[in-house]
């Protein structure tokens, strides 16, 4: 059963035998029987990332930027964006050195 906060209409979450709104702090007592109804479980899955590797063909069409390669020190690289995490998180920026071909990433 899902319960929403009567003050701000956000989802109430179980905490220490009570239901609590994470937004406004409103709390509501639950009965012993009702507390099982609101039990909160979080399941994490071990997800493997699938990362696209950009081969040398087609690199000329990618934008370039001035950034130092951590491997050879060259100051120019191709770059592209790719969604590697949840959709509500920012994209990951990948770089590929124009000189040595080393690829690395930066998270925003």
UniProtKB/Swiss-Prot annotation:
Zinc finger (TFIIS-type) boundaries: 65-105
Cysteine disulfide links: none
SMART domains: RPOL9, ZnF_C2C2
Transmembrane segments: none
GO BP terms, alphabetized: DNA-templated transcription; regulation of DNA-templated transcription
GO cellular-component term (any): DNA-directed RNA polymerase complex
Protein's recorded name: Transcription factor S
Source organism: Methanocaldococcus jannaschii (strain ATCC 43067 / DSM 2661 / JAL-1 / JCM 10045 / NBRC 100440) (Methanococcus jannaschii)
Gene (name only): tfs
């Amino acid at each position: 059963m899902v319960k929403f906060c009567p003050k701000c209409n956000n989802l109430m979450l179980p905490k220490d035998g009570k239901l609590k709104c994470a937004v406004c702090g409103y709390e509501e007592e639950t009965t012993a029987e009702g507390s099982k109804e609101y039990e909160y479980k979080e399941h994490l899955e071990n997800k493997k990332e699938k990362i696209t590797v950009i081969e040398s063909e087609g690199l000329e069409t990618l934008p370039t930027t001035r950034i130092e390669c951590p491997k050879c020190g060259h100051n120019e690289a191709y770059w592209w964006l790719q969604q590697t995490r949840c959709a509500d998180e920012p994209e990951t920026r990948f770089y590929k050195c124009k000189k040595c071909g080393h690829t690395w990433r930066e998270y925003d």
